């Protein structure tokens, strides 16, 4: 979880009221933070805040905490209002960045009065947002510049590395792009995000002055922000527009809390145009009875409205529904329980009387888990070895290497590694990878796994369903379809199921040696001999026969 430093005197000038240290310890809870440490320096008190929610970057600074406290105490209510004026400033985005770092969003904040503490908070907030929300700058990189020292319009360009030279931040000499990546502290840390690309991203002004080389480093000589800076130009780049727009909203509203005036920037892409930032409030709706039923305390309609307004919501009641508008610097409201959480934060968890449950509860194993374990025991009894592989995978493993067309799968929005960028929709690719990593071991190799596959299901609240499956793979020089079918036959016989196999053509299997497994007219699995192309894709040197079946249809239907 993010940890960050704030000064007591800075918080209090932003709130407009003084508090004791003990009072601050309670007030931090409104901002989903805890006090991790307290110390004194040159007669001033400082706090180290430990954020308890990685989905609230708006709370990772003195400005965000002070804003939350003002609303929670009822000093202000409802939706925060930020005035935004248009500017004639434009940024042109190079289409050649589409495979390097395709998106940039921008803003200007004017009329600032900065001191040492305010400057520390700006820099710290940038770093925390880029580190956590930005996945160490992979998804979000932030630059801030003294706007009065720049010459708009600006150009977010794709430039050949050998043509790049400028003085990077905290340096005294001009360096080439390669020198920056190899010698500069930030180049060593973040250079891998662009190194080896035919072009590097570069932000320049109309006079060709380099402002930054995102996501690595800013320029030392053009636009460095100091305590004398009155207007800040903000540049945020990344791979996902929604994510970098959120980051921009967090930064500009934090600066607005210090009296800054926000101005928009026109961002010109080849095929579309944006005006950023966009602080249009977001909307959500929740059943009023849901809140009352689950809150655990007696709340009237008026109570709920009051509590939500103290958490920066604009509230309307329509036919027992609560229609809400909330700030654009939040993206964590995804379910009614998120609204309920805010109600209880405003109410105060410390004000809820603990109750000891009256029901005696005795724990027991989940019946379906017991069923899965019985399947495992059965497979071991057939002489197979159990393996346990990861639920996370990638499109290449699920489709390309298995020689089948791509389909919709559940993907991770911000994966740390492309190898682990999706949830698997079937288990056989995982066993093929296992076999590919054990070609040096003795054959035959007869393995199985009981594991989860995640499928798209639009009818469900989460739009997905997790299915338990059994997969078996057998590898040796003389393996055939028949050997896999014999194991399948034994499994289904023990489960009390009659089945048929309907021949199909499927890219993962040899034509004429693949089939769907049908039970009571429904497809429950697939069986076949692995296609030579698939074996080659995985680097598996032996023939393989395999099958995979859903387990849920057989639950409660067998002696197990």
Swiss-Prot record:
One of its GO terms (molecular function) is phenylalanine-tRNA ligase activity. InterPro entries: aa-tRNA-synth_II/BPL/LPL (IPR045864), B3/B4_tRNA-bd (IPR005146), DNA-bd_dom_put_sf (IPR009061), Phe-tRNA-ligase_IIc_bsu (IPR045060), Phe-tRNA-synth_IIc_bsu_arc_euk (IPR004531), Phe-tRNA_synthase-like_B3/B4 (IPR020825), Phe_tRNA_ligase_beta2_arc (IPR022918), PheRS_beta_core (IPR041616). PROSITE patterns: B5. Its cofactor is Mg(2+). SMART domains: B3_4, B5. Keywords: Aminoacyl-tRNA synthetase, ATP-binding, Cytoplasm, Ligase, Magnesium, Metal-binding, Nucleotide-binding, Protein biosynthesis. Belongs to the phenylalanyl-tRNA synthetase beta subunit family. Type 2 subfamily. Tetramer of two alpha and two beta subunits. This is Phenylalanine--tRNA ligase beta subunit. It comes from Thermococcus sibiricus (strain DSM 12597 / MM 739).
């Amino acid at each position: 979880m993010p940890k960050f430093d704030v000064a007591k005197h800075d918080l209090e000038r932003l709130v407009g009221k003084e508090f004791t240290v003990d009072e601050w310890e309670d007030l931090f809870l409104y901002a989903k933070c805890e006090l991790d440490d307290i110390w004194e320096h040159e007669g001033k008190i400082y706090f180290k805040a430990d954020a308890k929610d990685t989905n609230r970057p708006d709370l990772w600074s003195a400005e965000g905490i002070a804003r939350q406290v003002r609303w929670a105490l009822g000093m202000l209510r409802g939706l925060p209002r930020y005035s935004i004026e248009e500017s004639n400033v434009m940024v042109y985005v190079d289409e050649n960045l589409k495979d390097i770092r395709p998106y940039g969003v921008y803003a200007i904040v004017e009329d600032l009065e900065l001191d040492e503490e305010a400057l520390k908070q700006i820099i710290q907030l940038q770093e925390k947002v880029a580190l956590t929300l930005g996945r160490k700058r992979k998804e979000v990189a932030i630059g801030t510049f003294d706007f009065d020292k720049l010459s708009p319009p600006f150009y977010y360009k794709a430039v050949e590395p050998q043509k790049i030279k400028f003085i990077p931040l905290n340096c005294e000499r001009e360096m080439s792009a390669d020198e920056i990546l190899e010698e500069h502290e930030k180049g060593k840390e973040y250079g891998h995000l662009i190194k080896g690309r035919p072009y590097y991203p570069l932000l320049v002004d109309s006079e060709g002055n380099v402002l930054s080389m995102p996501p690595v480093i800013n320029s030392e000589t053009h636009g460095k922000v100091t305590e004398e800076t009155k207007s800040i130009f903000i540049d945020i780049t990344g791979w996902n527009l929604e994510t970098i727009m959120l980051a921009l909203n967090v930064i500009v509203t934090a600066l607005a809390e210090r009296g800054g005036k926000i101005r928009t920037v026109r961002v010109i892409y080849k095929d579309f145009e944006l005006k950023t930032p966009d602080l249009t409030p977001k909307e959500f709706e929740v059943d009023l009875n849901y809140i009352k039923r689950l809150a655990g305390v007696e709340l009237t309609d008026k109570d709920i409205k009051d509590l939500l307004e103290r958490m920066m919501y604009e509230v309307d009641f329509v036919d027992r529904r609560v229609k809400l508008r909330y700030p654009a610097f939040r993206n964590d409201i995804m379910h009614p329980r998120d609204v309920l959480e805010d109600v209880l934060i405003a109410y105060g968890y410390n004000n809820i009387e603990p109750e000891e449950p009256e029901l005696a509860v005795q724990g027991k194993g989940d019946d379906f888990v017991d069923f899965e374990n019985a399947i495992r025991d059965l497979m071991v009894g057939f002489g197979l070895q159990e393996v346990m592989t990861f639920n996370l995978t990638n499109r290449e493993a699920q489709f390309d290497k298995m020689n089948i067309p791509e389909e919709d799968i559940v993907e991770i929005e911000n994966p740390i590694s492309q190898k682990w960028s999706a949830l698997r929709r079937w288990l056989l690719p995982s066993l093929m990878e296992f076999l590919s990593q054990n070609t040096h071991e003795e054959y035959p190799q007869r393995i199985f796994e009981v594991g989860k596959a995640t499928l798209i299901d639009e009818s469900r609240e989460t739009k997905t369903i997790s299915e338990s499956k059994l997969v078996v793979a057998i590898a040796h020089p003389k393996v055939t379809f028949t050997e896999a079918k014999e194991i399948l036959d034994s499994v289904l016989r023990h489960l009390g199921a009659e089945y048929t196999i309907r021949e199909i053509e499927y890219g993962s299997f040899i034509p004429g040696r693949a089939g769907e497994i049908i039970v009571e007219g429904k497809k429950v699995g697939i069986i076949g001999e692995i296609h030579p192309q698939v074996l080659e894709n995985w680097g598996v040197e032996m023939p393989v026969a395999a099958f995979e079946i859903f387990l849920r249809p057989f639950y409660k239907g067998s002696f197990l």
